[in-house]
C-alpha cells in the first residue's frame, strides 16, 4: 500500500516537474532575434504607471516581461529587485501582461517590487519585441541597441551576467 502511494506521488511529481524542465519558463515559441538591432521605441501607460523607453537613453536597460501567474517570473522577481538595489545605475523596467489589475498589484505587494513597473494587458509592448514567453528580458545598451535576450529566470547574481552588464 505504501509503495503504491509512493509510486503515485512520484508519477505526480514527474508530471508536474518534467514539463518545467522541458519547456523552461512560460515560453510558447521563439521569434526572430532582435539582438544587435535598435530597441523599438514605446510608451505604455496603465492609468497608474507609465514607461517611455526614450526617457532611458544613456542608461543600460533591462526590459523584463512577466506575469503574476508565471512560476519562473515568481522565482526571478526577488533577484531583479536585489539587482535593482545593488545596481541603481541600471534601469530595470518590468512590463506585466496581467489582465487582472488586482493580481498585478498583489504580486507587487507580495514581493515588495520597487522597480519601475507597468501593466500592459494587451501585450502591445511584448508584441513589438516579438515576446511570447515569460519571463523574458531584453538587455538594452546606452545607445538603445538590444544586446541580449534572456528567456526564463536566470541567476542575475551570476558573475558572467554581472560582468556582461558591466561592459555596457
Model-derived segments and spans:
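N-terminal targeting signals for export/organelle localization
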Residues: 1-47, 158-168
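A short beta-strand-turn-helix
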Residues: 41-61
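Signature tryptophan residues that serve as conserved aromatic anchors
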Residues: 42, 66-69, 156
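Short pre-active-site segment immediately N-terminal to redox-active cysteine/selenocysteine motifs
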Residues: 59-61, 65-69, 133
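Hydrophobic beta-strand core positions in alpha/beta domains
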Residues: 62-64, 94, 139
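Structural microenvironment flanking redox-active thiols in thiol-disulfide oxidoreductases
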Residues: 74-111, 121-127
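Thiol/disulfide oxidoreductase modules built on the thioredoxin-like
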Residues: 106-113, 121-166
Amino acid at each position: 500500500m505504501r509503495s503504491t502511494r509512493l509510486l503515485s506521488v512520484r508519477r505526480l511529481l514527474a508530471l508536474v516537474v518534467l514539463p518545467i524542465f522541458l519547456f523552461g519558463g512560460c515560453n510558447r515559441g521563439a521569434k526572430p532575434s532582435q539582438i544587435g538591432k535598435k530597441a523599438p521605441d514605446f510608451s505604455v501607460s496603465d492609468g497608474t504607471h507609465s514607461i517611455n523607453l526614450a526617457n532611458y537613453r544613456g542608461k543600460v536597460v533591462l526590459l523584463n516581461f512577466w506575469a503574476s501567474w508565471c512560476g519562473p517570473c515568481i522565482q526571478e522577481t526577488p533577484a531583479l529587485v536585489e539587482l535593482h538595489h545593488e545596481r541603481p545605475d541600471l534601469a530595470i523596467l518590468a512590463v506585466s501582461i496581467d489582465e487582472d489589475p488586482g493580481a498585478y498589484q498583489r504580486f507587487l505587494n507580495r514581493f515588495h517590487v520597487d522597480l519601475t513597473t507597468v501593466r500592459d494587458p494587451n501585450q502591445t509592448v511584448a508584441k513589438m519585441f516579438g515576446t511570447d514567453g515569460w519571463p523574458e528580458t531584453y538587455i538594452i545598451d546606452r545607445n538603445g541597441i538590444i544586446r541580449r535576450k534572456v528567456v526564463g529566470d536566470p541567476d542575475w547574481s551570476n558573475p558572467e551576467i554581472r560582468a556582461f552588464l558591466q561592459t555596457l
